[in-house]
A protein has these predicted regions:
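Short, histidine-centered active-site or binding-site loop motifs used for metal coordination
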Residues: 12, 76-79
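Short, acidic Gly/Pro/Ser/Thr-rich loop/turn segments
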Residues: 38-39, 80, 147-149
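Small-aliphatic-rich amphipathic alpha-helix that forms the alpha element of a beta-alpha
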Residues: 34, 73, 80-124
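C-terminal helix-cap and adjacent tail motif
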Residues: 4-14, 18, 130-163
Length: 163
């Protein structure tokens, strides 16, 4: 089987991480893959990386919303672009698939749009230099799993309709 297809079929979301950091050179490869995601009209969403101490208060929860992952990458996209959600989602997919190909585990954490629409989130965006028009698409947590690798769930019948 083709190695790329194999990676796509075997990647799983991991919801428990060790404290071990992803080496900088590996993280840079993952981020570069995100930069090369397809996007409408060649407009690439912004990436803000290496947020290891994101405050749970901003996420609106008292527990760790990032499952103990040592690295959080936030994907933002320009809300002025009609394809901002699609563009950012492709970046998220590239990040997670590249991570898997490099032996790093990942998970997409939702609520980025809500987080960065809050006053605390807007303050973080301003601090990081993210333009006001950019909205949060997702948090991509990265690290090394602390438990067993998740098994694939059964796929539903009728996913593909051929006409």
């Amino acid at each position: 089987m083709n190695e790329t297809i194999k990676n796509l079929l075997e990647r799983r979301s991991v919801r428990g991480y060790k404290e071990d950091l992803v080496p900088e050179e590996v993280l840079n490869e993952i981020l570069e893959a995100g930069e090369y995601a397809p996007s409408g009209m060649g407009q690439n969403p912004e990436l803000v990386a290496k947020l290891s101490k994101m405050n749970a208060d901003v996420m609106g929860t008292e527990s760790d919303p990032f499952y103990g992952a040592p690295t959080v990458v936030v994907v933002f996209a320009d809300s002025n672009m009609p394809t901002c959600v699609e563009n950012g989602s492709l970046v998220m997919g590239n990040l997670m698939n590249a991570a898997h190909a490099l032996g790093v585990d990942s998970c997409w954490i939702h609520r980025a749009r809500e987080v960065f629409a809050s006053e605390e989130g807007k303050a973080l965006k301003a601090e990081w230099g993210v333009p006001e028009s950019y909205v949060g698409i997702g948090h991509c947590v990265l690290g090394y799993r602390s438990g067993e690798y998740p098994k694939a769930k059964a796929r539903k019948d009728g996913f593909v309709i051929r006409v």
